[in-house]
């Protein structure tokens, strides 16, 4: 079972990815982890990627496709895999298809921007322990204070509203077009496309996922 997971940052992809991995025994492949592993292992592609990253440049699509092909040929991918954070653009999706990497299911977790802003900009963290709160969904007993130590809570830079909106803008510009792209691939009978309402409870989304990923 080869799966691509699509959705904006903060849509809940990570939680559902965990569910899919545990339920179906397939690894989650993230390009970041894959790059780090290849660099650490010193593979030819890893060394090439390291050179590019050390120069502060972006790793090319060709190089990443090479790494994906290398990674999915490993034993733990026999039953399939879950691609996370790749492809991000239509050229990357085209390159995957050109390299014969077929996909069985494309899953989109759809959450409106304003809901994502509410979710992410409401997060508060206790820097000392990493405990995470949310002003709406999981508030601390005393506003702005950690339940255990009473110390101040902080907002991670990634969760600042302006940062969240910027990341959403990039998602809509680069990755959202993949929704239409894979819709066409599915219409041609070459994959299955499923869209889920990510504003539902985690359990509800997981149950719906399980019903289509039989």
Swiss-Prot record:
<feature type="binding site">
    <location>
        <position position="36"/>
    </location>
    <ligand>
        <name>AMP</name>
    </ligand>
</feature>
<feature type="binding site">
    <location>
        <position position="156"/>
    </location>
    <ligand>
        <name>AMP</name>
    </ligand>
</feature>
<dbReference type="InterPro" id="IPR000850">
    <property type="entry name" value="Adenylat/UMP-CMP_kin"/>
</dbReference>
<dbReference type="InterPro" id="IPR007862">
    <property type="entry name" value="Adenylate_kinase_lid-dom"/>
</dbReference>
<dbReference type="InterPro" id="IPR006259">
    <property type="entry name" value="Adenyl_kin_sub"/>
</dbReference>
<comment type="pathway">
    <text>Purine metabolism; AMP biosynthesis via salvage pathway; AMP from ADP: step 1/1.</text>
</comment>
<feature type="region of interest" description="NMP">
    <location>
        <begin position="30"/>
        <end position="59"/>
    </location>
</feature>
<dbReference type="InterPro" id="IPR033690">
    <property type="entry name" value="Adenylat_kinase_CS"/>
</dbReference>
<dbReference type="GO" id="GO:0005737">
    <property type="term" value="C:cytoplasm"/>
</dbReference>
<comment type="similarity">
    <text>Belongs to the adenylate kinase family.</text>
</comment>
<dbReference type="GO" id="GO:0044209">
    <property type="term" value="P:AMP salvage"/>
</dbReference>
<feature type="binding site">
    <location>
        <position position="123"/>
    </location>
    <ligand>
        <name>ATP</name>
    </ligand>
</feature>
<keyword id="KW-0808">Transferase</keyword>
<feature type="binding site">
    <location>
        <begin position="57"/>
        <end position="59"/>
    </location>
    <ligand>
        <name>AMP</name>
    </ligand>
</feature>
<keyword id="KW-0067">ATP-binding</keyword>
<comment type="function">
    <text>Catalyzes the reversible transfer of the terminal phosphate group between ATP and AMP. Plays an important role in cellular energy homeostasis and in adenine nucleotide metabolism.</text>
</comment>
<dbReference type="Pfam" id="PF00406">
    <property type="entry name" value="ADK"/>
</dbReference>
<comment type="subunit">
    <text>Monomer.</text>
</comment>
<feature type="region of interest" description="LID">
    <location>
        <begin position="122"/>
        <end position="159"/>
    </location>
</feature>
<keyword id="KW-0545">Nucleotide biosynthesis</keyword>
<feature type="binding site">
    <location>
        <begin position="10"/>
        <end position="15"/>
    </location>
    <ligand>
        <name>ATP</name>
    </ligand>
</feature>
<dbReference type="Pfam" id="PF05191">
    <property type="entry name" value="ADK_lid"/>
</dbReference>
<feature type="binding site">
    <location>
        <begin position="85"/>
        <end position="88"/>
    </location>
    <ligand>
        <name>AMP</name>
    </ligand>
</feature>
<feature type="binding site">
    <location>
        <position position="200"/>
    </location>
    <ligand>
        <name>ATP</name>
    </ligand>
</feature>
<dbReference type="GO" id="GO:0004017">
    <property type="term" value="F:adenylate kinase activity"/>
</dbReference>
<dbReference type="InterPro" id="IPR027417">
    <property type="entry name" value="P-loop_NTPase"/>
</dbReference>
<protein>
    <recommendedName>
        <fullName>Adenylate kinase</fullName>
        <ecNumber>2.7.4.3</ecNumber>
    </recommendedName>
</protein>
<feature type="binding site">
    <location>
        <position position="92"/>
    </location>
    <ligand>
        <name>AMP</name>
    </ligand>
</feature>
<keyword id="KW-0547">Nucleotide-binding</keyword>
<keyword id="KW-0418">Kinase</keyword>
<keyword id="KW-0963">Cytoplasm</keyword>
<feature type="binding site">
    <location>
        <position position="31"/>
    </location>
    <ligand>
        <name>AMP</name>
    </ligand>
</feature>
<feature type="binding site">
    <location>
        <begin position="132"/>
        <end position="133"/>
    </location>
    <ligand>
        <name>ATP</name>
    </ligand>
</feature>
<feature type="binding site">
    <location>
        <position position="167"/>
    </location>
    <ligand>
        <name>AMP</name>
    </ligand>
</feature>
<dbReference type="GO" id="GO:0005524">
    <property type="term" value="F:ATP binding"/>
</dbReference>
């Amino acid at each position: 079972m080869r799966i691509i997971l699509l959705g904006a940052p903060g849509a809940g992809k990570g939680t559902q990815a965990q569910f899919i991995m545990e339920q179906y025994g397939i690894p989650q492949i993230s390009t970041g982890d894959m790059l780090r592993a290849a660099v650490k292992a010193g593979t030819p592609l890893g060394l090439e990627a390291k050179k590019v990253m050390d120069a502060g440049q972006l790793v090319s699509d060709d190089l990443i496709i090479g790494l994906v092909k290398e990674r999915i040929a490993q034993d733990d991918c026999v039953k399939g895999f879950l691609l996370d954070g790749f492809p991000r653009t239509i050229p990357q999706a085209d390159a995957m298809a050109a390299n014969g990497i077929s996909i069985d299911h494309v899953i989109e977790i759809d959450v409106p921007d304003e809901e994502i802003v509410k979710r992410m900009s409401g997060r508060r963290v206790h820097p000392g322990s990493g405990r995470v709160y949310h002003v709406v969904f999981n508030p601390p007993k005393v506003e702005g204070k950690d339940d255990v130590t009473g110390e101040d809570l902080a907002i991670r830079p990634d969760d600042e509203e302006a940062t969240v909106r910027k990341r959403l803008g990039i998602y809509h510009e680069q990755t959202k077009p993949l929704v239409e792209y894979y819709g066409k691939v599915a219409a041609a009978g070459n994959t299955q496309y499923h869209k889920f309402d990510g504003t539902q409870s985690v359990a509800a989304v997981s149950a719906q996922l399980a019903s289509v990923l039989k």
